[in-house]
Structures are given as structure tokens and as C-alpha cells.
């Protein structure tokens, strides 16, 4: 993936900036990112808010789906949670392209805790692929 596109997406996605997401790897149809669970991400029972995990997975989805250079926008997404994440834990999200046609793409994101790869959540998403390319 063009490094200019990665930089553009990293710098201009305000939620990814707020989450302080680190981009570890991006290649065509794949991304791997990380973030540390902070206190302002916790819900009332002191576990990471599901919306923060969803947004984290969604950014991995955005990177992988836009890695071909054409603008791809999410049209459907779903997440299932298995284990909680706690304050100070590092989360890793890996996104894999499971299929892509001229206009649509399907992606799977796995979120886990880095220290032991304990599974946290599974996210699936679909994109609509526009004709427009990134101009950065």
C-alpha cells in the first residue's frame, strides 16, 4: 500500500487519532494495528467500552479495504465480543480480505490481547468500492 495513503488515513481519521492507534503493518488486503486501553475508554464496570473496540477494529478494516488505492467505504459491519479488555492492556487487530469484486469487498478482523493472543472480538465488514482513487 502506498505509504502516502497510510499517512493520510492515520492523520485524518479523528477517531483513530483519539484512540492513539499504532499502524504496525499494511499491505494489499491486510492490516495489523495496536492500541493501549486507556481509562477514558472504560465503561461503568471498568472494562473497555465495546464502542472503542468496534472503532479500533473499524480502522483496521478501513486500512485493509483501502489498501488497493481506490476509495472504499463501509456499508455493513458486525462485531461479536468474547473476552473483555482491561485498563493498560495492549490490543492487536488484524484484518484480512476474504473476498473482493469490482464494487464490493468483504473483510474479517480479529481483535486479541497481545501478551497471550487471547481472543477479544471478531468483526466482519463489507465495503463499497468507488471509482475514485486517493489523491494525496
Model-derived regions, located:
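A generic structural signal for short beta-strands and their flanking turns/coil linkers
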Residues: 17-19, 29-31, 71-77, 89-91, ...
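Catalytic strand-loop segment that frames the active site of acyl-thioester-processing enzymes
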Residues: 18-48
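Compact, glycine-rich, soluble single-domain proteins
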Residues: 43-62
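Hydrophobic beta-strand-centered segment that forms part of the acyl-chain substrate-binding groove
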Residues: 62-91, 97
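HotDog/MaoC-like acyl-thioester-processing domains
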Residues: 85-87, 92, 98-136
